[in-house]
């Protein structure tokens, strides 16, 4: 049913046949490899981030065209503040440049912007760019482009537990009534319902770890790791990752239909 190409080879443009009925509703991507991409070309790390921003634009449109409902991109983690100051300052400027140049295309493609993370800790100009993008695309009802910005899964879970504890303390919730749905509603992905949890998680650049990203939400996600660095990631690479996803038998803890 499917024709695959090597998802580790960005130069391989062999067509991939996808089942349009089995496109993952929520795709999450850990965008990794910008710095190594730049280093391999004897460029400063920020050059990799700039090229990575261009990749975000291309993949956003590609995912929307494929019928993805939510595209979540890990843009900046709570741990990324440990990077060199010049690099952090550049990364904080990227959302401003991105939204200034790309919001018209998002509106044209009916894509709505959502941001999760501790946005109030970001520089004022970055916060303003985020707020404007959300406001400008609020009437779009196609794919949601969800940025994880100053986000960390452990911090998210702590914040969610604090919300639930406050509800219990205020008499709004009984301890015995706390269940999966309670936790889902307390997490930063709640506004994405019913697509809170990624169906497919992709990490680029050959690293095979989760890096404090959506740890509650990926309990039953399919994971695809590709050697392709984020600036080299193309629509064809995305299609190959989705083809890999479609080749799998998702069991959600149960038995395979073939056994």
Curated annotation (Swiss-Prot):
GO cellular component, one term: cytosol
PROSITE patterns for this protein: UPP_SYNTHASE
Cofactors required: Mg(2+)
Keyword Metal-binding: yes
Keywords, in A-Z order: Magnesium, Metal-binding, Transferase
Residues reported to bind substrate: 33-37, 45, 49, 77-79, 81, 83, 203, 209-211
Catalytic residues in the record: 32, 80 (proton acceptor)
Binding locations of Mg(2+): 32, 222
EC number: 2.5.1.31
CDD domains per UniProt: Cis_IPPS
Molecular function GO labels: ditrans,polycis-undecaprenyl-diphosphate synthase [(2E,6E)-farnesyl-diphosphate specific] activity; magnesium ion binding; manganese ion binding
Cofactor: binding details: Binds 2 magnesium ions per subunit.
Catalytic activity: 8 isopentenyl diphosphate + (2E,6E)-farnesyl diphosphate = di-trans,octa-cis-undecaprenyl diphosphate + 8 diphosphate
Stored InterPro entries: UPP_synth-like (IPR001441), UPP_synth-like_CS (IPR018520), UPP_synth-like_sf (IPR036424)
Enzyme class: transferase
GO BP annotations listed: polyprenol biosynthetic process
SUPFAM superfamilies linked: Undecaprenyl diphosphate synthase (SSF64005)
Transmembrane region(s): none
Function: Catalyzes the sequential condensation of isopentenyl diphosphate (IPP) with (2E,6E)-farnesyl diphosphate (E,E-FPP) to yield (2Z,6Z,10Z,14Z,18Z,22Z,26Z,30Z,34E,38E)-undecaprenyl diphosphate (di-trans,octa-cis-UPP). UPP is the precursor of glycosyl carrier lipid in the biosynthesis of bacterial cell wall polysaccharide components such as peptidoglycan and lipopolysaccharide.
Subunit structure: Homodimer.
Family: Belongs to the UPP synthase family.
PANTHER family: DEHYDRODOLICHYL DIPHOSPHATE SYNTHASE 2 (PTHR10291:SF0), DEHYDRODOLICHYL DIPHOSPHATE SYNTHASE FAMILY MEMBER (PTHR10291)
Name the UniProt record assigns to this protein: Ditrans,polycis-undecaprenyl-diphosphate synthase ((2E,6E)-farnesyl-diphosphate specific)
Gene: uppS
């Amino acid at each position: 049913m499917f024709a695959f190409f090597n998802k580790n080879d960005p130069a391989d443009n062999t067509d991939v046949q996808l089942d349009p009925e089995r496109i993952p509703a929520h795709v999450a991507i850990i965008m990794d490899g910008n710095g190594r991409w730049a280093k391999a070309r004897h460029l400063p790390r920020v050059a990799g981030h700039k090229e990575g921003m261009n990749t975000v634009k291309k993949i956003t449109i590609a995912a929307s065209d494929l019928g993805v409902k939510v595209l979540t991109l890990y843009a900046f983690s709570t741990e990324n503040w440990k990077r060199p100051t010049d690099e952090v300052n550049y990364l904080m400027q990227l959302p401003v440049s991105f939204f200034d140049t790309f919001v018209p295309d998002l509106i044209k493609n009916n894509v709505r912007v959502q941001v999760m993370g501790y946005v109030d800790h970001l520089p004022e100009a970055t916060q303003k760019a985020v707020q404007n993008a959300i406001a400008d695309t609020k009437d779009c009802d196609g794919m949601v482009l969800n940025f994880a910005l100053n986000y960390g899964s452990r911090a998210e879970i702590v914040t969610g537990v604090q919300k639930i504890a406050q509800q219990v303390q205020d008499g709004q919730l009984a301890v015995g009534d706390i269940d999966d749905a309670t936790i889902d509603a307390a997490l930063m992905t709640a506004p994405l319902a019913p697509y809170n949890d990624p169906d497919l998680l992709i990490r680029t650049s050959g690293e095979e770890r989760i890096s404090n990203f959506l740890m509650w939400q990926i309990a039953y996600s399919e994971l695809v790791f590709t050697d392709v660095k984020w600036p080299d990631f193309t629509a064809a690479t995305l299609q190959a990752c989705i083809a890999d996803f479609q080749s799998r038998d998702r069991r959600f803890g149960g038995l395979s239909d073939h056994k």
